[in-house]
Amino acid sequence: QSGVIFANKDIDTANKLKDLLITNYYRISTSTDINGVEVCAAIKNIFAMAIGAATGLNKTKIKDNTYLNTSAALFRQSIYEMEIFVDFLNGKKETVKSLAGLGDLYVSAAGGRNSKMGALIGDGIVFSKATKNNMPNVTVEGAELIFEIGQKVKKDFDEKKLPLMIAMINAIIYDKKLEIKWENF
């Protein structure tokens, strides 16, 4: 099974496309929130890196799935900050709780380039070294987006409002170890 979301300012057009392409294994939802869907598609990559960092950020000495609680905390914060960011860019907060937000973030955080880079950063490896030694010639969309929007985000938002996103921005742009201010969650 697979699910996607089609966004169009005209819901009838989106629904016609849905009717043409839907199958018993390819499920399609529709939305008129073009801004929200597009913003979620982009910023979920930043948050997938953050969630991927959980294995290294977990500070217990127990070796098993204890990082899952850290992942859950990061996932929840990611959704919260995605809502703030989508709203800021004139999207609808509820879009974050659709396939465009929650669904896409889950898939990206479960595996892939952003999650892999996040795991390296969570282990204390700075971005430039992680890129050079572990992921050369690999495009990490979340990092690319941070280089594009990071400074503007830091200018427009207080660190207490988007603590996770700003922690990722600081780690990538300034090439330093990831420092999350958990007290701001």
Describe the function of each predicted region.
Residues 68-103, 110-111, 123-137:
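Small-residue-rich helix-loop
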Residues 15-19, 47-54, 76-83, 87, ...:
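Predominant activation on well-ordered alpha-helical scaffold segments within soluble catalytic domains
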Residues 37-38, 107, 138:
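Short, small-residue-enriched loops and turns at beta-alpha junctions
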